[in-house]
Amino acid sequence: MNRTQKKTLVLLLGILVGLGILLAVVSAVVMAADCVARLVLPERSAVPCYAPVGCLALVFAMWGGARESRGLWDTFRMAATDDEPPYLVTETEKGACKQAGSVPGFYTTALRENTAAVWQNALMPVVLMASIVFAGLSSLGQERGDDFLLNWSAILGAGTTFALPLCWGMPFSRLARHFHKAGCAVAGWCGAEKISRRRAMILTDGDLFPPGTIQLNGVKVFGEDLSRVSSYAASMARAADCGLQRLFDGLLRSEGGHYEKVDDFSFYEEGGYSATIRGESVLLGTASFMRKMEVRLPGGINLRTGIFLAMDRQLAAVFAVKYQPSENVDFALRMMRRSRITPILASRDPNITPALLKRKFHKGVKVEFPSLTDRVAFSEAELDRGMPRALLFREGLLPYAEAVVGSRRLCKAVRRATALSVLGSVAGTLLSFYMVFQGAYNLLTPLALLVFLLLWALPVLLLADWAGRY
């Protein structure tokens, strides 16, 4: 970032923090005025001032602003690692999608207002006006005008909940630090909400079986030259742009072959591809695909993940392909299942099906397996470049899953914490009004009010800790 961008960022952070502590500042000023009133107004009720409550409210407000600033610091520090990160995560109609990396748009998205700030800005004038009205009713309305500042400070202090300034800053800073360690960065509330809204992730061949996990255990040729067979298979895999491309490319290089021109390429729902190479009809796919295409297979071949090549409806080669599960992928799939994030399988490899995933990974893995047309369209979405809601700086499924799952946890924690904070503010305002109206100052002591506000802040702190445990 240049100097102008840094100054703009500092100014925006100052505005956000200022809005967050404004109600606490007003509350502290009113309580300070009540301290003066106790000295100069002889008719004021002889009860302690609520100044400690106002001081602690300022502490919590500044703590929340500091945690938010720390979260943005970790996020932007990670985003500044590379001007062109390997991948970004954006939203689609079906769910989160990983695409080629791009930074522009990430910073402005990260600085958009979060839901806690929206509620805080909406609640601040309501609580302030309600406290003035209630203070007037409980003092001037009962001919106790000298108690106006006392009642106002009590009602406003109870309505200025300690929890609301922490609703966003605490979980966000915790998740931002966690994301930094995982090699990703999420663009604040807006980015987290966008990529986790659908509770789904589009996964391709490379996400489930990264390079090195698909191996060739052997090749059997039927009346053809191995170099020609490898050229045809590699050309078909490259045209399909599937996970087998790297495997057959290695075979092609070892056999000294070359890529052929592929015409009339088509995908088949049955698990294979067809094309025309040098005027020959070429098929590449699974054993079941070959049978449906009326290609005769020899007996005794029992390869659950074998790939078969046929030329002019005659079997030319059989490739024994082995899929080695990755521990990181298995961990990511378990994490997604625990958080109820649905994987959408956008595979082009005919072997990568829900049945294969259950054999290779834990049996509880559940994926959405759309039609062939949708799978191809979803996999092509990776070639687009949408708005960066999150940035990924490491390869593999795990950082991708961390970003989406963590974003969902973050949004849930912030929504729940905000709801509890608003409820606590409303409850505190009404209860304190009732007590001061009845003159029950012996129940509404500064210590009792502090305990009340701290108890409402405790669930928010627990939710912030919960957000980072997944």
In which residue ranges do the predicted regions lie?
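Short, positively charged
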Residues: 173-190, 249-256, 280-290
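A short acidic/small-residue loop/turn micro-motif
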Residues: 217-221, 323-325
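Bateman (tandem CBS) regulatory domains
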Residues: 154, 213-217, 229-235, 314-317, ...
